Amino acid sequence: MSKFSKNLKPITFPTHNIGKSLLSLYDVGSMSGLTEVLFMERCLRLLKKGGRMGMVLPEGVLNTSNLQKIREYFEGKAKIILICSIPQDVFIAAGATVKPSLVFFKRFTEEEELQYLGAKTRAEKEIRQKYIGQIKALQEKIVEEKSKKLKVKALIAAAEKELRDLEKAIIEEAKPLTKEYFHYEIPIAMVEDAGITSTGAVSAGNQLPTLQDEYKEYRIAKKLWNEANSAVSYTINSQGRLFRTSDGKEVELKW
């Protein structure tokens, strides 16, 4: 044991998140506590810019109305490069009964981040022009009420609330326009046989290899990304801090 003790070092775990709610560590934590949603954000954060990932997700994440804000969050961070619906049979043997989909993301590159921000800014500016008269009228009303000696707090509060509501409405109305200005194709596929039966046995007509070949041709033709030969590694130091090394560059991954 003595020869090993020289190499053993105590690990100091980070304490900056102790006592905090788990959900508070996530951007989406205020919108949803679903584990699959939190997992999506965590995986996306671990990716380097331009990095890709694939996940198995319940189809509800893609189409349920109460997760709309979640979808908008990820649409502002990454491109969806493929959605593939797979049979419910695939995970029945494991006890899962939810209809699944394979979803593949590519985190924005720095250039795409700027493009998305530009599209969002342009859309919001354009929509704001439609309401500029109302905005100015409310702002003037607030200034006028605050300048009076006998200030009516209820009137000021009502005008400020109306202005906040109008700002929220502008942001919501601009979202479809942002998608229009930041437009890209999202290929969608459906396979009836994913290689596994409802009993967990291997099926004979697996369509996924064919889809893989077809998608490879598609992504090369569309120049979705270039093949990279650089190695990516992850390490945790003695203080419990997580680092990613890629192309010889080390970056600390933080919450």
Predicted features by range, described:
Residues M1-W255:
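A conserved structural/catalytic subdomain of Rossmann-like adenosyl-cofactor enzymes
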